[in-house]
From Swiss-Prot:
Pfam families: KH_2 (PF07650), Ribosomal_S3_C (PF00189). Residues 18-87 form the KH type-2 domain. Coiled coil: none annotated. Part of the 30S ribosomal subunit. It comes from Thermofilum pendens (strain DSM 2475 / Hrk 5). One of its GO terms (cellular component) is cytosolic small ribosomal subunit. This is Small ribosomal subunit protein uS3. Binds the lower part of the 30S subunit head. InterPro entries: KH_dom, KH_dom-like_a/b, KH_dom_type_2, KH_sf_prok-type, Ribosomal_S3_C_sf, Ribosomal_uS3_arc, Ribosomal_uS3_C, Ribosomal_uS3_euk/arc. The gene is rps3.
Amino acid sequence: MSTTARKVISQGLQYMMLNEYLQRQLVRANYVHAQFFKTPIGTKVIVYAGVPGLVIGRKGANIKAIAEVLEREFGIENPQIDVVEVPNQDLNAKIMAYRVARALVRGVRFRRAALVALNRIMAAGARGAEIVISGKLTSQRHRTEKFTRGYVPKSGEPGEELVDEAIVHVLLKLGMYGVKVRIMKPAKMPDTILIKGVTQVG
């Protein structure tokens, strides 16, 4: 294996560990993902979250603490953290999965939690959405329930390019539950053909 390949793999593993750390620390802030860019003076870190204020913390205390951990534990040189609020949050699979999971924690029945989320997603303009909840839903046996609205492609270019997907796990009294959300974005399908009106001449 070449030195370049090793470097790429090492960097990929580091970013995966960084993402897992930020996910744990910023779950209440509806953390979605982060980007890392090398700069002449250090590393620029862009954190995308649903509630930026919880990332920053009171007087910036939380974001300063995170920066210290990134530098000390992960070797990120002089991290400069910016926080970006995720737009159109009802169309973001990760944030909607968080919302369903929190509803389950509050004791909302899983069907109601899923249907409320589906209504919000479709009202926001999605072409389709799918929510899968797994765990001990109504008994001591583990099972899975799926709720779908509209059209959500499973494969091909639409499934890869136009579907946002996320999974969130939450620990309840009966055990671990999984919430998977897939959202078909309100975009034109690749095979959509627009037929314009024909003007007759003569």
